[in-house]
C-alpha cells in the first residue's frame, strides 16, 4: 500500500491503551484502533485522551489506523 492509497480522517482520542495504541472516535461516527506514527514517536509528542488527531486508514482494513498528526487546541 502506498501513501496515496491511505484514507485520512480526523477524530478524537477516547482511550489510551498499552503499547502506544489508542481508541479514536472519527468524525463520521466510526471507532478505530490506532497506533502512533514514527515521526510522532521520534519527536516525543504526547497524545492524551481528548486530543484531536489526524488518522490514516488503510483501504483494506478500516478498523485500524495510524495517528499522523495531533491538531492544535483552540
UniProtKB/Swiss-Prot annotation:
The keyword rRNA-binding applies. Residues 1-72 form the S1-like domain. Keywords: Cytoplasm, Initiation factor, Protein biosynthesis, RNA-binding, rRNA-binding. GO terms for cellular component: cytosol. It is found in: Cytoplasm. This is Translation initiation factor IF-1. It comes from Synechococcus sp. (strain JA-2-3B'a(2-13)) (Cyanobacteria bacterium Yellowstone B-Prime). InterPro entries: NA-bd_OB-fold, RNA-binding_domain_S1_IF1, S1_domain, TIF_IF1. It comes from the Bacteria. GO terms for molecular function: ribosome binding; rRNA binding; translation initiation factor activity. Component of the 30S ribosomal translation pre-initiation complex which assembles on the 30S ribosome in the order IF-2 and IF-3, IF-1 and N-formylmethionyl-tRNA(fMet); mRNA recruitment can occur at any time during PIC assembly. The keyword Cytoplasm applies. Belongs to the IF-1 family. One of the essential components for the initiation of protein synthesis. Stabilizes the binding of IF-2 and IF-3 on the 30S subunit to which N-formylmethionyl-tRNA(fMet) subsequently binds. Helps modulate mRNA selection, yielding the 30S pre-initiation complex (PIC). Upon addition of the 50S ribosomal subunit IF-1, IF-2 and IF-3 are released leaving the mature 70S translation initiation complex.
